[in-house]
Amino acid sequence: FGYLIFVVQFEYGFSIISGALALTVFNLPQMTRNVEDSLKHVHHTQREAGLALGISRWETVVHVVIPEALPGIVTGVVLASGRIFGEAAALIYTAGQSAPALDWSNWNILSVTSPISIFRQAETLAVHIWKVNSEGTIPDATIVSAGSAAVLLIFILIFNFGARKLGSYLHKKLTAA
């Protein structure tokens, strides 16, 4: 899907933007469902209490419902991000399999050799692990892929713990808990 739409039809080619759009399309339904479930699990008495205090429906949503649903929303974002970090298949066909040599003196966003260009090919850690294991061009491929997998795992763990701390902090800050 991502290859056909973003690479071929929109003519973005193998690029960061093609990979990002493909991953967004793939993960949007799951994230939407998680946010919807979080908002539905806010007890109706809290909504009614906000309305009984005389605040508008919009203020009830902003000041009562969303702060109460925030841990579930953060969880949904973390789950979707975890899937994105480990995604290799969609990125192989949309973002490419290798990163080009970058010209660090070139800051033109449209140049494919610029480090800030979203139109250049890219290689994520998950794609790197797949590529090292499947091509066999590196003599110590097992060690390189194991090291890359360890870096990816550590990064995901740090991200998850950071997201949990952020969710707890925001929940305490926005609610009376």
Segment roles from a protein language model:
Residues 45, 56-57:
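Short coil/turn motifs that cap or connect alpha-helices
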Residues 36-47:
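Membrane-helix/interface signature in polytopic inner-membrane proteins
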